[in-house]
């Protein structure tokens, strides 16, 4: 993907290209992500094409707060290893710092469920 975007090193050129794409081809799969207010939409715009849009910042903060509000006091999400892993991935994609206390608590919760060989129980 990096090679593809190299042709538009300037983020403003990337933005123009994406805006043209979603305008001219409303059925293009990226159109959904471009307009999405989900974590996937924000993450795609931030990480996939490298656009940190001003319009996304309040939404990004709202999504992070929403995810963190679901965390149980002991650190897990829905008492599930898979769900906790997914939430950690989402938080990372949304740009939450790895040293955030809630992320550290979730990682510790996962470590406590790890077997001696590294597998999760």
Regions found by a protein language model. Name each.
Residues 1-121:
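Preference for long, amphipathic alpha-helical scaffolds in soluble/luminal domains
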